[in-house]
């Protein structure tokens, strides 16, 4: 069906959303999540599929123009890379529409005809003589109403009149007839409402009034004559507005156990005679264990997902069933997991570190934790006769595989010396910083600086794109200035490519910012810029980018 302006499903158009240039799109059937969005009453809108970003949105008809007719005029309205990609995609769609059908899978082309469902709604209400209401969670609220006139020969004309006033055809999922089984107070309210409706009809001096079936506010249920009802969600889902151009997380390639990094080959490492354990084979852990094995160390590994241990077992590592088994089988155990909570679970949980005999055993915590967590673990390890060292790592996945990390250690000095051959295999420098807690504080300060700087890079490149500048040119100029660094160039290139391969997960960066803010809170040190950056990372994580690289914070800054 076409609307008053002649638009039909599959028509190609230019659609303008507030804050954006006119964008090439296609008139579409709204997907399920979009039909739940409340739109303004009596304003004709169309569901638009935007090319390039592959999202849907309701757009007012006044902001829609035919694609071919306005093509020459609007092609120069925006110079961003995303716009050019969208134009290229719509031209490819024109040439080969069958190649794009997978993008429209969320559209429900086989929905029942809205006119038929609307007629069923009206006929069911008048024949039963009882109140009817719509229980519809898949369409915008407050867009449908029925006249409270008696059933006469004018019924068909009234239907046409009501349907003509609707800006959008609705898919009525269910019609519920509420029987007279409620308490007397509910019946009285229903009777009172009907009496008011009848009085309004008898008043010939006023025009016919329409009674809304669903309230326009989508939150007030007091006007509905319901015996029972489910709570109405006040927060209407608007996730599609935030789910603008996103990318699927790139698959993490399996680590190549046969290759040896140039940095490791250039070092003359004499492997220690001690036996080392390693808990956690994540993004950073895999690279470190690989270098320990390639440098000749004897290693026992454990990971929550046992399948990750196979490659290391083939390369010469032993595999233990539980963390406590690793402690029993080794002299020194390294732990490198996701966050402080997981680190505590490994120590205090079932079959954890504390379940083993710790007398004379060394435990090295490499997880990014706060000073309080490190102190808690240290106290328990030492209380059972063990030795403790915190060894915080600075670097990325590539640096872990190359063996060029930075190690910040604090705790028992003798244990630090015993681990030197391991630190030589996985890092280019290791620093001993004294008492437990000093290394974690230093690490949080460095992570805070890195996170704030990365958020600034993301916002700068987002502004450049919005201003019509080429992000590649911005990065080339930036490389020539004193602001240039390896971090800036790596993250900048990742943003331009839009791939965000995980070097350091965004959720881990946000975790470190949160821990830095907690530490500052205890010291009464204000960190307003860090706090603002933390909110940006939290939003990006909320959009589903927590497991992507931290450079994916650009998605939040740009969209």
UniProtKB/Swiss-Prot annotation:
InterPro entries the UniProt entry points to: 3-OH-isobutyrate_DH-rel_CS (IPR002204), 6-PGluconate_DH-like_C_sf (IPR008927), 6PGD_dom2 (IPR013328), 6PGDH_NADP-bd (IPR006115), GLYR1_PWWP (IPR035501), HIBADH-like_NADP-bd (IPR029154), HIBADH-related_NP60_sf (IPR051265), NAD(P)-bd_dom_sf (IPR036291)
Ranges of residues in domain PWWP: 9-70
PROSITE patterns in UniProt: 3_HYDROXYISOBUT_DH, PWWP
Region feature Disordered, mapped onto this chain: 106-137
A Gene Ontology BP annotation from the UniProt entry: transcription elongation-coupled chromatin remodeling
GO MF: DNA binding; NAD binding; NADP binding; nucleosome binding; oxidoreductase activity
Keyword annotations of the record: Chromosome
Residue sites binding NAD(+) per the record: 277-291, 511
Subcellular location per the Swiss-Prot or TrEMBL entry: Chromosome
Region annotation Dehydrogenase domain: where it falls in the sequence: 267-559
Positions with biased composition (Basic and acidic residues): 108-125
SMART domains, per database record: PWWP
Keyword Transport part of the UniProt annotation: no
Gene Ontology CC: one annotated term: chromatin
Domain of life: Eukaryota
Chief location of this protein within or outside the cell: nucleus
PANTHER family recorded: CYTOKINE-LIKE NUCLEAR FACTOR N-PAC, OXIDOREDUCTASE GLYR1-RELATED
Subunit comment: Binds to mononucleosomes.
Family per record: Belongs to the HIBADH-related family. NP60 subfamily.
Function: Nucleosome-destabilizing factor that is recruited to genes during transcriptional activation and colocalizes with a subset of trimethylated 'Lys-36' histone H3 (H3K36me3)-enriched regions.
Domains: entry comment: The PWWP domain is a H3 reader and strongly binds DNA. In the dehydrogenase domain, the conserved NAD(P)H-binding sites and sequence similarity to plant dehydrogenases suggest that this protein may have oxidoreductase activity. However, since the active site is not conserved, the dehydrogenase domain seems to serve as a catalytically inert oligomerization module.
Protein name: Cytokine-like nuclear factor N-PAC
Natural source organism: Aedes aegypti
Taxonomic lineage of the native organism: Eukaryota, Metazoa, Ecdysozoa, Arthropoda, Hexapoda
